[in-house]
């Protein structure tokens, strides 16, 4: 039910949005580029929201947490899918069967053409799986754990995921933020005429 309501909220936001490009402002050196704000402007406010997930090494799971909107560290992901793709080290039985059915072997070499598709490669020098922006995503690993599973690198943990969870700090005024538990999201708003 909550997911259905959240989906309706997102749809309403996107339909009602007047192309708001402004997002909550952080103190210098505290903007976290991994945070994905969804924003819209109405007659009174600019409103934005975000959800954050972190990787819990003890449980090998990605969990939602109460991020404040600024700062923190790299163990912060805008979706559970992004967190799992970057951090989960053990492939599930389903994933193993899925990749076996694909019957496609991905190369453990690190050569690639730079592009805009985020994938994983094996760095042959350090023997570690690393994220890279590639041109042809079909020939590179879609997730960190698939790279680890196929290439057996020296390190099986992603540096993004080794940090403990940090809740960060709140955006600067005039942004006002509050947590809406029903949507499990942080909402921030700013009156339209404030600077």
UniProtKB/Swiss-Prot annotation:
Domain of life of the organism encoding this protein: Eukaryota
UniProt GO molecular function: serine-type endopeptidase inhibitor activity; toxin activity
Protein's name according to its UniProt entry: Anticoagulant protein rhipilin-2
Cystine pairs: 26-87, 39-70, 62-83
Domain BPTI/Kunitz inhibitor intervals: 26-87
Annotated Gene Ontology cellular component terms: extracellular space
Localization (cell): Secreted
Record's note on what induces expression: By blood feeding. Expression is most important during the early stage of feeding.
Pfam families: Kunitz_BPTI
Phylogenetic placement of the source organism: Eukaryota, Metazoa, Ecdysozoa, Arthropoda, Chelicerata
Physiological role: Anticoagulant protein that inhibits the serine proteases trypsin and elastase, but not thrombin. The anticoagulant effect of this recombinant protein on blood clotting is found only in the activated partial thromboplastin time (APTT) assays, but not in the prothrombin time (PT) assays.
Cross-referenced InterPro entries: Kunitz_BPTI, Kunitz_BPTI_sf, Prtase_inh_Kunz-CS, TFPI/VKTCI-like
PROSITE patterns xref list: BPTI_KUNITZ_1, BPTI_KUNITZ_2
GO biological process per UniProt: envenomation resulting in negative regulation of voltage-gated potassium channel activity in another organism
Broad class of the protein's primary localization: secreted
Reported tissue expression: Primarily expressed in salivary glands and weakly expressed in the midgut of fed ticks.
Keyword terms, alphabetized: Blood coagulation cascade inhibiting toxin, Disulfide bond, Hemostasis impairing toxin, Protease inhibitor, Secreted, Serine protease inhibitor, Signal, Toxin
Range of residues in the leader sequence: 1-20
